């Protein structure tokens, strides 16, 4: 029995050893068959824009794809480095809500207007004598107590709902909106807004091919630098809007599903928004909030 047990143990050790050696041999062969994926961002795709502004030591620039509008297949032509303090901020949705409500109230005017007892026609005489009739005393039939009389404490339009929101809150709202758009893959960066044709159908088919949604907001640096083809193409489309970078706002970004920025507009937005973080408390009257812009 002892000899049988020793022989069986030797056979099992030989089998297990051969299995281990065979598995190790297979594991050594697998890396030769399966090649590791290369970092396409570092080897193949060029960096078309580098963030030249100062970045905190504990943060790194955010990388995003740069696309082209000159063709359907030119979806990714390179990379762009974005400043993390503008395109990677904390998602303060309460700030976005404050800025959006402020923008809507900024242009809101109520024209509701009611007449007081002095403006309603009639009621010049006392309806009945003060005493003796048994009825309640009244001095005019146009009193607010009467039907058809004037309104007490009614709206006296036009009424403006304008109020001033702090400049840094507005800048933070823009940063949060840009960050949310980028994280939701609704922010696309292009090298320019050059189109091969001025046909609106080309722009519509391009947006459908790239799944940009039902509404697109195109942003360029200035009106003068906007290409003629994109101006002609967007003029006949209700779902495409074209604005300069200085007019970009939170309400427009929330209203449109996709935001398209050019490389010069990205540099402009980073410069202006980061300047708000380091600006000194203004010594001038607040009625001139833009007088110290760089």
From Swiss-Prot:
Gene Ontology MF term list: structural constituent of ribosome
Q: In the record, which positions carry Omega-N-methylarginine?
A: 147
Superkingdom per UniProt: Eukaryota
Sequence segments annotated as region (Disordered): 119-139
* Principal location listed in the UniProt entry: mitochondrion
GO cellular component term, pick one: mitochondrial inner membrane
Q: Where in the cell is it found?
A: Mitochondrion
Entry's Gene Ontology BP terms: mitochondrial translation
Does the UniProt entry include the keyword Ribonucleoprotein?
yes
Q: Which Pfam families match?
A: Ribosomal_L4
Q: Enumerate the UniProt keywords alphabetically.
A: Methylation, Mitochondrion, Ribonucleoprotein, Ribosomal protein
Gene3D superfamilies in the record, alphabetically?
A: 3.40.1370.10
Do you know which HAMAP family this protein is assigned to?
Ribosomal_uL4_B (MF_01328_B)
The UniProt family comment states: Belongs to the universal ribosomal protein uL4 family.
Q: Which NCBIfam families does its entry note? A: rplD_bact
Q: How does it assemble?
A: Component of the mitochondrial ribosome large subunit (39S) which comprises a 16S rRNA and about 50 distinct proteins. Interacts with MIEF1 upstream open reading frame protein.
Query: What is the name attached to this protein's record?
Result: Large ribosomal subunit protein uL4m
Originating organism = Mus musculus (Mouse)
Organism placement in taxonomy: Eukaryota, Metazoa, Chordata, Craniata, Vertebrata
């Amino acid at each position: 029995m002892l000899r049988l047990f020793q022989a069986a143990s030797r056979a099992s050790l030989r089998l297990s050893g051969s299995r281990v050696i065979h598995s190790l041999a297979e594991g050594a062969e697998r890396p030769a068959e399966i090649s590791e994926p290369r970092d396409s961002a570092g080897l193949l795709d060029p960096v078309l824009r580098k963030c030249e502004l100062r970045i905190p030591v504990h943060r790194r620039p955010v990388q995003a794809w740069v696309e082209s509008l000159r063709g359907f297949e030119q979806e990714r032509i390179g990379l762009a480095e974005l400043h993390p303090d503008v395109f990677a901020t904390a998602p303060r949705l309460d700030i976005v809500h404050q800025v959006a409500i402020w923008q809507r109230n900024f242009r809101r005017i109520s024209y509701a207007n009611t007449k007081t007892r002095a403006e309603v026609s009639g009621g010049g005489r006392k309806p009945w004598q003060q005493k003796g009739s048994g009825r309640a005393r009244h001095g005019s039939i146009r009193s607010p107590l009467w039907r058809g009389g004037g309104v007490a404490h009614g709206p006296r339009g036009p009424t403006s709902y304008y109020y001033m929101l702090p400049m840094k809150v507005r800048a933070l709202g823009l940063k949060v909106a840009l960050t949310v758009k980028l994280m939701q893959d609704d922010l696309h960066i292009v090298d320019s807004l050059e189109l091969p044709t001025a046909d609106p159908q080309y722009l519509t088919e391009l947006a459908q091919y790239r799944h940009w949604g039902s509404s697109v907001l195109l942003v360029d640096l200035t009106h003068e630098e906007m290409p003629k083809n994109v101006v002609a193409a967007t003029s006949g489309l209700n779902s495409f809007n074209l604005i300069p970078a200085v007019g970009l706002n939170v309400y427009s970004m929330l209203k449109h599903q996709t935001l398209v920025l050019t490389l010069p507009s990205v540099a402009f937005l980073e410069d202006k928004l980061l300047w708000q973080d380091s600006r000194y408390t203004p010594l001038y009257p607040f009625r001139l909030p833009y007088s110290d812009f760089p």
